[in-house]
A protein has these predicted regions:
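Conserved beta-alpha
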Residues: 97, 101-162, 246-251
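C-terminal functional extensions of proteins
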Residues: 216-255
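N-terminal glycine-rich anion-binding loop in soluble enzyme alpha/beta folds
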Residues: 1-66, 131-171
Protein backbone atom coordinates (compact mmCIF):
# COMPACT_ATOMS: atom_id res chain seq x y z
CA UNK A 1 0.00 0.00 0.00
CA UNK A 2 1.30 3.46 -0.88
CA UNK A 3 0.43 6.72 0.79
CA UNK A 4 0.63 10.30 -0.52
CA UNK A 5 3.37 12.43 0.96
CA UNK A 6 2.24 14.61 3.83
CA UNK A 7 2.73 18.29 3.06
CA UNK A 8 1.19 20.78 5.49
CA UNK A 9 1.86 24.48 5.16
CA UNK A 10 5.12 25.50 6.81
CA UNK A 11 5.56 29.04 8.10
CA UNK A 12 9.12 30.19 8.65
CA UNK A 13 9.83 33.01 11.06
CA UNK A 14 13.04 34.91 11.73
CA UNK A 15 13.21 35.59 15.45
CA UNK A 16 15.26 37.95 17.64
CA UNK A 17 17.62 35.78 19.67
CA UNK A 18 16.40 37.12 23.02
CA UNK A 19 12.68 36.87 22.19
CA UNK A 20 10.73 34.39 24.34
CA UNK A 21 7.15 35.42 23.46
CA UNK A 22 6.55 35.02 19.75
CA UNK A 23 7.33 31.30 19.44
CA UNK A 24 4.84 29.95 22.02
CA UNK A 25 2.19 32.50 21.08
CA UNK A 26 2.50 31.78 17.36
CA UNK A 27 2.28 28.04 17.94
CA UNK A 28 -0.85 28.55 20.04
CA UNK A 29 -2.40 30.72 17.34
CA UNK A 30 -1.79 28.03 14.73
CA UNK A 31 -3.34 25.29 16.90
CA UNK A 32 -6.75 25.35 15.12
CA UNK A 33 -5.02 24.14 11.95
CA UNK A 34 -3.57 21.01 13.53
CA UNK A 35 -1.16 19.40 11.07
CA UNK A 36 -2.30 21.75 8.28
CA UNK A 37 0.11 24.45 9.49
CA UNK A 38 3.32 24.54 11.47
CA UNK A 39 5.68 27.32 12.54
CA UNK A 40 9.47 27.03 12.28
CA UNK A 41 11.93 29.53 13.70
CA UNK A 42 15.42 30.77 12.97
CA UNK A 43 17.25 33.17 15.28
CA UNK A 44 19.76 35.95 14.82
CA UNK A 45 21.31 38.14 17.49
CA UNK A 46 19.13 40.94 18.94
CA UNK A 47 19.73 41.90 22.57
CA UNK A 48 18.99 45.64 22.82
CA UNK A 49 16.55 48.11 21.26
CA UNK A 50 17.87 51.66 21.09
CA UNK A 51 19.16 54.17 18.55
CA UNK A 52 22.80 53.35 19.35
CA UNK A 53 25.07 52.23 16.55
CA UNK A 54 25.53 48.83 18.15
CA UNK A 55 21.78 48.30 18.40
CA UNK A 56 21.11 49.31 14.82
CA UNK A 57 23.97 47.09 13.61
CA UNK A 58 22.00 44.07 14.85
CA UNK A 59 19.73 44.54 11.84
CA UNK A 60 22.38 44.50 9.11
CA UNK A 61 21.46 42.30 6.18
CA UNK A 62 23.94 39.43 6.13
CA UNK A 63 23.32 37.84 9.56
CA UNK A 64 19.59 37.87 8.87
CA UNK A 65 20.07 36.33 5.44
CA UNK A 66 22.25 33.60 6.90
CA UNK A 67 19.46 32.76 9.36
CA UNK A 68 16.95 32.81 6.49
CA UNK A 69 19.09 30.36 4.51
CA UNK A 70 19.09 27.90 7.41
CA UNK A 71 15.34 28.36 7.84
CA UNK A 72 14.77 27.75 4.12
CA UNK A 73 16.18 24.24 4.53
CA UNK A 74 12.83 23.36 6.14
CA UNK A 75 11.13 24.26 2.82
CA UNK A 76 8.72 26.86 4.25
CA UNK A 77 5.94 28.34 2.16
CA UNK A 78 6.71 31.82 3.55
CA UNK A 79 9.48 33.41 5.61
CA UNK A 80 8.60 36.35 7.87
CA UNK A 81 10.87 38.70 9.76
CA UNK A 82 8.90 38.53 13.00
CA UNK A 83 10.19 41.76 14.44
CA UNK A 84 9.39 45.46 14.41
CA UNK A 85 12.72 47.18 13.69
CA UNK A 86 11.34 48.82 10.53
CA UNK A 87 8.99 50.81 12.76
CA UNK A 88 11.96 53.03 13.66
CA UNK A 89 14.41 52.20 10.85
CA UNK A 90 11.82 52.70 8.08
CA UNK A 91 9.68 50.38 5.95
CA UNK A 92 12.19 50.46 3.11
CA UNK A 93 14.51 48.47 5.39
CA UNK A 94 11.99 45.62 5.49
CA UNK A 95 11.17 45.89 1.80
CA UNK A 96 14.85 45.47 0.97
CA UNK A 97 15.23 42.64 3.48
CA UNK A 98 12.25 40.71 2.14
CA UNK A 99 13.43 41.11 -1.45
CA UNK A 100 16.88 39.86 -0.44
CA UNK A 101 15.43 36.86 1.43
CA UNK A 102 13.39 35.82 -1.59
CA UNK A 103 16.35 36.32 -3.92
CA UNK A 104 18.60 34.25 -1.65
CA UNK A 105 16.13 31.46 -0.81
CA UNK A 106 13.39 31.49 -3.45
CA UNK A 107 10.77 31.72 -0.68
CA UNK A 108 8.14 34.51 -0.48
CA UNK A 109 9.05 36.85 2.37
CA UNK A 110 7.21 39.37 4.52
CA UNK A 111 7.53 41.10 7.89
CA UNK A 112 5.57 42.34 10.87
CA UNK A 113 5.74 45.98 9.84
CA UNK A 114 4.78 45.26 6.22
CA UNK A 115 1.75 43.40 7.57
CA UNK A 116 0.81 46.47 9.62
CA UNK A 117 1.28 48.69 6.57
CA UNK A 118 -1.08 46.56 4.51
CA UNK A 119 -3.87 46.56 7.09
CA UNK A 120 -3.51 50.29 7.77
CA UNK A 121 -3.83 51.05 4.07
CA UNK A 122 -6.74 48.68 3.55
CA UNK A 123 -8.73 50.02 6.50
CA UNK A 124 -7.82 53.68 6.03
CA UNK A 125 -6.32 54.01 9.50
CA UNK A 126 -5.10 57.58 10.01
CA UNK A 127 -5.33 58.05 13.81
CA UNK A 128 -3.28 55.43 15.61
CA UNK A 129 -2.69 54.59 19.25
CA UNK A 130 0.78 53.18 19.94
CA UNK A 131 1.77 50.86 22.80
CA UNK A 132 5.35 49.60 23.18
CA UNK A 133 7.94 48.77 25.84
CA UNK A 134 10.48 51.01 24.09
CA UNK A 135 12.46 54.10 25.08
CA UNK A 136 11.51 57.64 24.04
CA UNK A 137 14.09 57.85 21.23
CA UNK A 138 12.59 54.79 19.55
CA UNK A 139 9.01 55.91 20.13
CA UNK A 140 9.74 59.34 18.65
CA UNK A 141 11.25 57.78 15.54
CA UNK A 142 8.25 55.47 15.13
CA UNK A 143 5.87 58.44 15.35
CA UNK A 144 7.91 60.37 12.78
CA UNK A 145 7.88 57.45 10.35
CA UNK A 146 4.13 57.08 10.67
CA UNK A 147 3.63 60.83 10.22
CA UNK A 148 5.51 60.57 6.92
CA UNK A 149 2.93 57.95 5.88
CA UNK A 150 0.02 60.21 6.82
CA UNK A 151 -0.72 58.40 10.09
CA UNK A 152 -0.92 60.45 13.29
CA UNK A 153 -0.03 58.92 16.64
CA UNK A 154 -2.84 60.44 18.72
CA UNK A 155 -1.85 58.69 21.96
CA UNK A 156 1.05 56.54 23.05
CA UNK A 157 2.33 54.58 26.03
CA UNK A 158 5.82 53.17 26.57
CA UNK A 159 7.94 51.61 29.31
CA UNK A 160 11.35 53.22 28.66
CA UNK A 161 13.07 49.83 28.46
CA UNK A 162 15.93 48.96 26.09
CA UNK A 163 15.13 45.25 26.43
CA UNK A 164 15.11 43.04 24.49
CA UNK A 165 14.78 40.00 26.78
CA UNK A 166 13.13 42.06 29.52
CA UNK A 167 10.16 43.00 27.29
CA UNK A 168 8.76 39.51 27.84
CA UNK A 169 8.71 39.92 31.62
CA UNK A 170 5.89 42.49 31.60
CA UNK A 171 2.59 40.66 32.26
CA UNK A 172 -0.39 40.85 29.88
CA UNK A 173 -2.37 42.92 32.38
CA UNK A 174 0.31 45.61 32.33
CA UNK A 175 0.05 45.78 28.55
CA UNK A 176 -3.74 45.88 28.91
CA UNK A 177 -3.49 48.90 31.22
CA UNK A 178 -1.37 50.71 28.64
CA UNK A 179 -3.86 49.94 25.88
CA UNK A 180 -6.76 51.14 28.05
CA UNK A 181 -4.94 54.42 28.68
CA UNK A 182 -4.27 54.97 24.97
CA UNK A 183 -7.87 54.07 24.07
CA UNK A 184 -9.12 57.23 25.80
CA UNK A 185 -8.01 59.21 22.72
CA UNK A 186 -10.38 57.09 20.56
CA UNK A 187 -7.90 56.24 17.78
CA UNK A 188 -8.92 54.29 14.68
CA UNK A 189 -6.82 51.39 15.98
CA UNK A 190 -4.23 50.61 18.64
CA UNK A 191 -1.00 48.89 17.64
CA UNK A 192 0.97 46.93 20.23
CA UNK A 193 4.33 47.16 18.49
CA UNK A 194 6.86 44.60 19.73
CA UNK A 195 6.95 40.85 19.11
CA UNK A 196 8.37 40.17 22.59
CA UNK A 197 5.47 41.90 24.38
CA UNK A 198 2.36 40.19 25.76
CA UNK A 199 -0.46 42.05 24.05
CA UNK A 200 -1.98 39.15 22.13
CA UNK A 201 -3.69 37.34 25.04
CA UNK A 202 -5.64 40.45 26.06
CA UNK A 203 -6.42 41.88 22.60
CA UNK A 204 -9.87 40.32 22.19
CA UNK A 205 -11.01 41.43 25.65
CA UNK A 206 -9.72 44.96 25.12
CA UNK A 207 -11.49 45.22 21.78
CA UNK A 208 -14.75 44.24 23.47
CA UNK A 209 -14.20 46.77 26.24
CA UNK A 210 -13.10 49.71 24.08
CA UNK A 211 -14.68 49.08 20.69
CA UNK A 212 -11.28 49.77 19.09
CA UNK A 213 -9.22 47.27 17.06
CA UNK A 214 -6.15 46.16 19.04
CA UNK A 215 -3.54 44.94 16.59
CA UNK A 216 -0.79 42.96 18.29
CA UNK A 217 2.52 42.41 16.50
CA UNK A 218 2.74 38.66 17.03
CA UNK A 219 -0.88 38.19 15.97
CA UNK A 220 -0.69 40.33 12.84
CA UNK A 221 2.44 38.50 11.70
CA UNK A 222 0.84 35.10 12.19
CA UNK A 223 -2.32 36.19 10.38
CA UNK A 224 -0.39 37.62 7.45
CA UNK A 225 1.75 34.49 7.13
CA UNK A 226 -1.30 32.23 7.12
CA UNK A 227 -2.78 34.23 4.25
CA UNK A 228 0.46 34.17 2.25
CA UNK A 229 0.72 30.41 2.86
CA UNK A 230 -2.78 29.89 1.44
CA UNK A 231 -4.69 29.28 4.67
CA UNK A 232 -7.66 31.19 6.10
CA UNK A 233 -6.61 33.39 9.05
CA UNK A 234 -10.26 33.80 10.08
CA UNK A 235 -10.15 30.30 11.55
CA UNK A 236 -8.08 31.69 14.42
CA UNK A 237 -10.19 33.13 17.24
CA UNK A 238 -9.54 34.42 20.73
CA UNK A 239 -6.51 36.55 19.85
CA UNK A 240 -8.30 39.67 18.63
CA UNK A 241 -10.02 40.65 15.39
CA UNK A 242 -6.76 40.96 13.46
CA UNK A 243 -7.12 37.45 12.02
CA UNK A 244 -10.54 38.22 10.59
CA UNK A 245 -9.33 41.62 9.33
CA UNK A 246 -6.38 40.08 7.51
CA UNK A 247 -8.63 37.39 6.04
CA UNK A 248 -10.75 40.11 4.41
CA UNK A 249 -7.83 41.76 2.63
CA UNK A 250 -7.88 39.39 -0.35
CA UNK A 251 -9.67 36.13 -1.13
CA UNK A 252 -8.05 33.16 0.57
CA UNK A 253 -6.41 30.91 -2.08
CA UNK A 254 -8.09 27.56 -2.55
CA UNK A 255 -5.04 25.70 -3.88
Amino acid sequence: MSFPAFDGRRIGMLTPSSNTVLEPYTSAMLAPFGDEASAHFGRFRVVEISMSGASQAQFTLEPILEAAERLAEANPHVIAWNGTSAAWLGLDKDRALCAAITERTGVPATSTMLAYDEIFRAEGIRRLGLVTPYIDDIQTRIAANYAAQGIEIVAEARLEDKGNYSFATYPPEQVAAMVTEVAQARPDAIAVVCTNFRGAPVAARLEAETGIPVLDSVAITAAHCLRVAGLDPARVTGWGSVFQRVARLTPVPTT
